[in-house]
Amino acid sequence: MSEDRSAYPFSTFLDQHSGQLNASDVPPELWHSLYKKLSDQTFDAGDHFQIICEMNEDDEKTLFVRALEDLHNNDEDNIFLIDHFMSFSSESARKCVESTEGLVERLAGLFGIDTDSTEEVDETVEKIETSVEKEEAEHAKKISSETGNLPRHESVDARLSSYSVDDPKNELTEKVLKALWKYSQTYSVSYQLDNGEIEKKSVWYVMDDFGTRVRHSTEPNVRIVPLMFLPQNCAYSIMFLTKPVNTDEEIMMDWASNVITAQHPEWRKYIEQPWAAQDFSKETMIPDAPTLEYFTSGRNPDFLAGPTEQQTCQSAIFTSLPILKKRKIKVYADDTQLTEHLKNHKVEYVDDIKKADVIWMIKHFHDYKQLSEENPCGMINQFPFESCITVKDLLAACAMRDPAKNDWYQLTYNLNTQLPEFVARFQNRELNGQHNVWIVKPWNLARGMDMTVTEDLNQIIRMIETGPKIVCEYIPRPLLFPRPDNGNKVKFDLRYIVFLNGIAPVTAYVYNRFWIRFAINEFSLSNFEDVETHFTVFNYLDKEKILQMKCENFIETIEKAYPRIQWSEVQKDINLTIRKAIEAAAKEEAPRGVAPNVQSRAMYGVDIMLQHGDNDVIKSTLLEINFMPDTTRACQYYPDFADTVFETLFLDEIDPTKVTPI
């Protein structure tokens, strides 16, 4: 492409890529040489380095890379392109490996894994284009042109799999999949959705035979970082020296270099587990209590009304309530999805918070002190510091304050603050043959997004590179539902709408109707990458896979399938679980907990899963609590839903046929 450089000048390259290069700490003196090599597609690492294969006395093969000549890190030409052999997402790794003919054997050769295959594995590995790479290329174009929804991966019913661990091919597949988390790296790409929002997706990749054979060291002499080359909508890795290298010296990189290692250098031995395994099973599994900074770092503070203002507001709301019931309700709203469905109550929208009876906001509100002073009669649909309920890592911190007494939330660790304790727990369970399947969740994304179910410690450790995560014990024995449409016994979860009217004491109600989300495939504790087996929330492309069922029909089916179950008893346990969660989140003073505020009311979407407990008793487990849940289906199914919301939260009209106190 050298003749085309005039059409793509260096200045344009800098405009498009300087942000990436600076973020990766690529020395500026190397940028022009990188530009030329990318433009000309010059892969010249083979002119300066050599892949070496050594066999020990046990015929075990070791692959590494050494320099063919003296090289200096200040030489502007000493920056090298590395191609990517394959790309995948964490949930699609197995599908990519199993569905591409010959890929298992080729990856085994790339990773230096012995194979009993009679077919000779070619040591020179050509690039494999997986479905993820095709998607990646298409979506990269959409960054600058069109918008589009993210794809979801195909799924295979677990019952249709002829998988057998005794099959040599499957044994090799498992070795390759485990090795992926030693030899893969990651970057993220941004997509613009139809609604204009920007969404990030993590892409994992394996470098070509050269890059893969650069071994790990805590004293590296090169760095290898990914770069998205925008003119081609294609990702490469680039390698540059961090110190001079002598002839025949092995080149090595720090595979464990990431944000968490930089923040917690004392954790390096845990983060290095994929490359330098150690036994931590005897170390403590109990993390320290979260600090005050844990609850405040990176979050905007809420300003609380004092006791005098609270008392004034309580009196003002009590006095104004009879008047409010007789006239239009003045509403300040930044979203009208719910309020436009009010039928029994007339609304007048106002654009000044000080004039509103009800403040209904999706945007987070912070100044409760100012509200108490300027509008003591007003009520708002948020509580101060309610992130302790609605944000995954903070809810987990509240739930895990006394894990021995916690029977409503799965054992959870924050990988960004409690990684050593989690590694010890995982290895201790592995040593004792205990259930050891975990689900990795991002702190701040909707359910089903960037989640991974796995029993691979190395994979879990690597997941911290794609953003803040918690890891929860996976429910091994969920109550299953017999789907009438496909006959599968599937996982499900329940979405409840909960109204919180007060914190001290807890005053809360649950809407008497709930919604059910079903998985698609037969449940089994295998094939953890299959989203349609292990997840219940995803964006369907195939609408025929959606099973909609009203709660009355669901209860009837469950009681018929499980004659020992009385739903009324299950519902009592669910209500108790929800109350325990709210009490745990409000147990300590703000910012370590939700703060009481007489002007506050809130509606939450609470997700519950049922599982078999001791003596096969059905027990409820809380998954998460969502701020301002989507009420589209609720308003469609139940035309009086919006009125019930306002009557319960703001008008003190509690209808026991619609809601139940918890």
From Swiss-Prot:
Disulfide bonds: none annotated. ATP binds at C472, E473, Y474, I475, K491, D493. Keywords: ATP-binding, Nucleotide-binding. GO terms for cellular component: cytoplasm; endoplasmic reticulum; sarcomere; striated muscle dense body. Disruption phenotype: RNAi-mediated knockdown at the L1 larval stage causes a reduction in egg-laying, likely due to a defect in the egg-laying apparatus muscles and in hermaphrodite specific neurons. InterPro entries: TTL/TTLL_fam, TTLL12. GO terms for biological process: egg-laying behavior; protein modification process. PANTHER family: TUBULIN--TYROSINE LIGASE-LIKE PROTEIN 12 (PTHR46088:SF1). Regulates microtubule dynamics in uterine muscle cells. Belongs to the tubulin--tyrosine ligase family. This is Tubulin--tyrosine ligase-like protein 12. It comes from Caenorhabditis elegans.
